[in-house]
Amino acid sequence: MSDRLTRIAIVSEDRCKPKKCRQECKKSCPVVKTGKLCIEVGSTSKSAFISEELCIGCGICVKKCPFEAIQIINLPKDLAKDTTHRYGANGFKLHRLPIPRPGQVLGLVGTNGIGKSTALKILAGKLKPNLGRFNTPPDWEEILTHFRGSELQSYFIRVVEENLKTAIKPQHVDYIKEVVRGNLGKMLEKLDERGLMEEICADMELNQVLEREARQVSGGELQRFAIAAVFVKKADIYMFDEPSSYLDVRQRLKAAQVIRSLLRHDSYVIVVEHDLSVLDYLSDFVCCLYGKPGAYGVVTLPFSVREGINVFLAGFIPTENLRFRDESLTFRVSETTQENDGEVKSYARYKYPNMTKQLGDFKLEVMEGEFTDSQIIVMLGENGTGKTTFIRMLAGAFPREEGVQSEIPEFNVSYKPQGNDSKRECTVRQLLHDKIRDACAHPQFMSDVIRPLQIEQLMDQVVKTLSGGEKQRVAITLCLGKPADIYLIDEPSAHLDSEQRITASKVIKRFILHAKKTAFIVEHDFIMATYLADRVIVYEGQPAVKCIAHSPQSLLSGMNHFLSHLNITFRRDPTNFRPRINKLESIKDKEQKTAGSYYYLDD
């Protein structure tokens, strides 16, 4: 019996359409043929029901289902117990819970759809854990008995008896536009229970947007408002779901400092974050989540920050002797980096001249530069310094006479914009067929781009129903599939989880090398930027007023230039070479600043 309990059947209610198929799963099931009701499809039911007790794990129904709605998953043996919550029969289930500790920041790291948001809801007291018994959910007394002897018991006793107040920053800040009416300043005044509104507005640079309404501000401003709205509340548990999306590097670190300032000896702070360098800087300890997205998730025991992130990247949990990913993820700096600028001159292929562009009150000056084939140039700068404007200038989006002082060469350009909120009614298959039919038929493109980005699973879904991360993967595929000289990609990491970011980086890098093209990329995730960059363009100046885009320079000198303005130093982790931010005023931080080496390549 123990063998059978470690198998779960997942039926996706979105994909399963019993009225549109011949119920192939039921007809082909060998257990049903023996007369047992392993798979049932009622005349009124919206999806099939699979009995996990009767299922023998043959996997025939998985192959036969025309909508790919079924997953049969064999779990590790020790997952027969410790179920915290399950969303109904054949639904997602979560094993164990992260363990928050008062006075410390708990970081959660894991892929999308693995149960991080479910864990947050349970810890916030918004969702009562059913311990896997969705038909007869237990009461709080039974739940506390289940967790007895662990740190979670004392935590849940406080949640139930003391009515702990929770303040949550949601994952998708775009929804604030639909909910909040009136200007942001008045909204923040209403929420201010700690009298800290002026302080947080100065810290998060919100003073200039307080008179505006939610629908008039950018994603980054909305994110900073959402963090401020949680900060001014008087609460016992503070939760932040992806606080760094839409923010630039400087704002991410400021947000991290603001979140850490919420710590009291009796308060809990929990953060879900996909930018690993920010998570590293922010957290005191980390819980990893692994499993199969949309099917089941397992929470590990707490690790120290460095060890936890390294465990996640290695894909192996030493405490449980369990491998949850086939390969480990490491960060070697770009193999094609040209260190000295003289080397580029010898085979420079393209040049662009000095340019200026006036857009309303904003003026951008671009210093002349050059680039070669098979090269990725990453643009580093704060929000509002004209990175997207420069991309559009190269793409020829502005008329020639409108302030460009000298001719820009004619480049055939493929452009992926920053936002990708597509409202198209067609399926992903139709969209790819319309836009990049030739590329999709090419086996090299299939193996280099479509399979690693897992686009095949999305083919029959309607574009407007996709999640943010799924839309982002489709947008990257569309951009790379279009034949062009230059690929301009604006924030490829937005909405992607840590694992998908690394996959997307590898896909872009491999494609650019194979196709012998050039890519200009805007990226705020530091780990992804350093992995991608062959050369960097640094932007400096006053955002939204006047900025300068410097000529492309080597990764080391460009990063040093950029980080010296931000007053941050990085070191490299000896295990997997990922960049780690030094704590401000630490010995390592002072040493590197004295030596003038803000960024390390040689560890």
Curated annotation (Swiss-Prot):
Residues 70-315, 344-566 form the ABC transporter domain. One of its GO terms (cellular component) is membrane. ATP binds at residues 110-117, 381-388. It is found in: Membrane. One of its GO terms (molecular function) is 4 iron, 4 sulfur cluster binding. InterPro entries: 4Fe4S_Fe-S-bd (IPR017896), 4Fe4S_Fe_S_CS (IPR017900), AAA+_ATPase (IPR003593), ABC_transporter-like_ATP-bd (IPR003439), ABC_transporter-like_CS (IPR017871), P-loop_NTPase (IPR027417), RLI1 (IPR013283), RLI_dom_1 (IPR034348). Residues 7-39, 46-75 form the 4Fe-4S ferredoxin-type domain. Pfam families: ABC_tran, Fer4, Fer4_RLI. Its main location: membrane. It comes from the Eukaryota. Keywords: 4Fe-4S, ATP-binding, Iron, Iron-sulfur, Membrane, Metal-binding, Nucleotide-binding, Repeat, Transport. Expressed in roots, stems, leaves, flowers and siliques. Belongs to the ABC transporter superfamily. ABCE family. NCBIfam families: PRK13409.1 (NF009945). This is ABC transporter E family member 1.
